[in-house]
Amino acid sequence: MDLKFSHVDVLVNNLEEACAYYAQVLNARISKTLIWERGGLHVRYAIALIGQERFMLVQPLAGNLKELLDASGEGMIYRHCYSTPDIEKAYDELMAAGVQPEDENGKPLARANLQSPSGARIIWLPKRFGHFSIEILEDKALEAFVEAAFS
């Protein structure tokens, strides 16, 4: 599978405070605030860009990530994200390897349903290491999404 590292997702209690900290202490560029809401999951998030490195600062409001934040606390890196030039090929390769891609709530994801509320096509691998997850996004859509987040 053709993958490259994209970013990590970090849980925060207060998005504005976390963004201010990353901007002040790490000289990060901060995107506009974005919303993800689907299937009981509701989060506010922003991209912190430090040089070429990206962090998604995620404030969960409802759903499994809110439960994880309440149980584990702020600052937890709960996801590594990778990008690929061909998300359908990645999906097919995972299925051929016996790995059923999932949606953001851990439910089986059909190849026809790769679209997300952010506009990017995304798949998640089943969680095999506690609460840690791996996400795969399509290159072109990811880069367009990041560019729009900073416009």
Language-model segments: residues:
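Hydrophobic, ordered structural segments
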Residues: E74-T84, A97-E102, R121, P126-E147
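Conserved short beta-strand elements that form part of the metal-binding/catalytic scaffold
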Residues: R29-A71, L114-A141
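Vicinal oxygen chelate
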Residues: K4-N13, A46-L49, L68-E93, P126
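Core segments of cupin and vicinal oxygen chelate
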Residues: D2-L3, V10-R54, A90, A96-Q115, ...
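Short acidic, gly/pro-rich beta-turn/loop elements at beta-sheet edges
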Residues: A20, V58, E67, A90-D92, ...
